[in-house]
Amino acid sequence: GFADLFGKVANLIKS
């Protein structure tokens, strides 16, 4: 879902 996608992107940016 969108939440999963957003979380994945956020994690990528955070890294």
Curated annotation (Swiss-Prot):
Keyword terms, alphabetized: Amidation, Amphibian defense peptide, Secreted
Subcellular location: Secreted
Chief subcellular location: secreted
Keyword Secreted listed: yes
Keyword Secreted: yes
Tissue expression profile of the protein: Expressed by the skin glands.
Transmembrane intervals: none
GO-annotated cellular components: extracellular region
Modified residues (Serine amide): S15
Single Gene Ontology BP annotation: defense response
Role according to the record: Inhibits the formation of NO by neuronal nitric oxide synthase.
Name of this protein: Signiferin-4.1
Organism in which the protein naturally occurs: Crinia signifera
